[in-house]
Regions:
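N-terminal ligand-binding lobe of clamshell/alpha-beta domains
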Residues: 1-311
């Protein structure tokens, strides 16, 4: 069985299901686990990823005015690989190559089938793993993953059950300029992690939030995890972040805690590491209750001191 993944989260799902040996091609953004980075790359971006967050945002908007997708698909390479299945998504044209591009390419690959993922909520992510496992003939692996999901989610819930009714207000930031806050599955994650959701609605795309609306929120916890940004990229935009959010107003009224998290690895990829992301969020929301997660994921997160300064 020959598999192509055009989405980082899909690649992680296939690896979790024990199918890494079947992978013959991936997208240009598939970087985990490291062993997939040597596989042929089937996509490239038309936007300029070297710009700051405002520049990337504007570059993507400009590309989408004039093109079907932000990404190019190497159709000739895809044909030469002769995959049996292509795993992609049809939810977000900014996240990966468009579904219509994949469909068009598959018309010339008569024996190739498309598995399309479309997660909006946590349950959709788990269902995508299960349905992919069943389609690819590894259903027990999918069931094994579902058991892991149930156990790890319940472990967080159980510890919170003995904690009382304290639920800090949690704001997650998905992009810095303009400010997007986490939507889709993030509100559910905040709820499970023992927090109150600020503004976002479960199952809905990440909304742009004005500074005026941010001033009204007064969050207890702010988790900054820009989509596709590793920690070093987010750190470069820390000064920009300070101009985008009313952090001084928040700090004057309450002791808001700020965290920077690797947004390339966590939260934004709807795959197996969403479980890791939930545990990170549990630590950020209740650090005294979940101290071990702070240690476990220390390489992927930074707790900022007051004044949004590095420790």
């Amino acid at each position: 069985m020959r598999l192509v993944s055009l989405l980082p989260s899909a690649t992680e799902i296939l690896v979790k299901l024990g199918l890494e040996k079947n992978l013959i091609g991936v997208s240009h953004e598939c970087d985990y686990p490291e062993t997939v980075q040597s596989l042929p790359r089937l996509t490239s971006t038309r936007a300029n990823p070297s710009l700051d967050s405002a520049g990337i945002h504007n570059s993507v908007l400009e590309v989408m005015k004039n093109a079907v997708s932000v990404y190019d698909l190497d159709v000739e390479l895809l044909k030469s690989l002769k995959p049996d299945f292509i795993v992609t998504q049809d939810l977000c044209d900014v996240c990966a190559v468009s579904f219509s591009q994949v469909e068009e390419a598959c018309r010339e690959l008569l024996d190739c089938k498309i598995i399309s993922l479309r997660p909006k909520r946590l349950g959709d992510i788990w269902d995508d793993v299960l349905s992919t496992a069943e389609t690819l003939g590894v259903k027990p692996k999918g069931q094994q993953f579902q058991q892991e999901v149930d156990e790890r989610v319940q472990a967080v819930r159980d510890r919170l059950a003995d904690w009382g009714n304290e639920r800090p207000k949690v704001l997650t930031i998905e992009w810095i300029d303009p400010i997007y806050i986490g939507g889709m599955w993030l509100p559910e994650m905040i709820d499970i992690a023992g927090g109150q959701v600020c503004l976002a609605e479960s199952g809905q795309p990440a909304p742009i939030i004005s500074r005026e609306d941010l001033e009204k929120i007064e969050p207890d916890v702010v988790v900054v995890k820009p989509c596709g940004y590793k920690l070093d990229q987010t750190l470069k935009e820390l000064d920009l972040l300070k101009t985008q959010i009313p952090w001084q107003d928040w700090g004057a009224r309450l002791s808001t805690r700020f965290y920077l998290v690797d947004g390339n690895s966590y939260f934004n990829r709807p795959g197996p590491r969403i479980l890791d992301s939930l545990e990170i969020l549990a630590h950020c929301t209740h650090p005294d209750l979940f101290p071990e997660f702070g240690e476990q994921y220390a390489s992927g997160m930074i707790s900022l001191q007051s004044g949004l300064e590095l420790p």
